[in-house]
């Protein structure tokens, strides 16, 4: 990697007019240079693209805004932005996120180690004291969880660490990772699990995924989809199941994932998630041929053994 690699920051907009201003203002405060800013508008029904361009001009940032004719989902829109970019390092950033001045420099520094392919941030809720994410892990049935979530930050996550995945709210990676493992999987339409899938494929290819605590971020979570709505549960569980079917061995699915799923189902409130869960199971059955095709494509690119270092405790 170059001494001061060029960075491409890719932000996908979808009805983001209410949050993109603070995001762009925070990018203007970044100490690291050079970087380019690319924004992809995913057929927003508001004036996200116009507002984003205006905010960038006001803050003195050069910005390329590309408008898609239809909502292609987060992964496909991100891939479109990456195709327009030229940086050796790529930062995928949500429009409802605000970086600290030294965030980008800390991410680039974490990526300097040759074996590190992806780096993620210490993510705060808007109070800037409560942690939202300090790296992530995956349970046996594909449930994702954030280290540190809802904990006050008192320095307990100040050491860098290798993790299973980092949140797509702010994910930095070397371009060579995408050259090796392929783009984000647009099959996770419209959102959820595309970054988890990318991190798993990168690890399978021999790269490390690291949590870089000096890179800090504020994330106003789920402005677009809404957190803990029926739609959220459906999309999350549909893509969780697809993630498992695509990436894990059949023995793992039978011996660990299925028993864990049964145990987890016995512990949750059925009225809260029953309808979206049943719908998610059904849709995955109907979509199984396409998921198996995606599995075969991934296996063709990645001949290394599957990574199944999940957590067995609820």
Positions of predicted regions on the chain:
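Short, acidic, metal-binding catalytic loop of nucleotide-sugar glycosyltransferases
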Residues: 25-34
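A conserved acidic beta->alpha catalytic loop
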Residues: 26, 41-50, 70
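Glycine-rich, basic loop-to-helix element that forms the pyrophosphate-binding segment
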Residues: 67-85, 95
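Short aromatic/hydrophobic "clamp" motif used to bind/position activated sugar donors
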Residues: 90
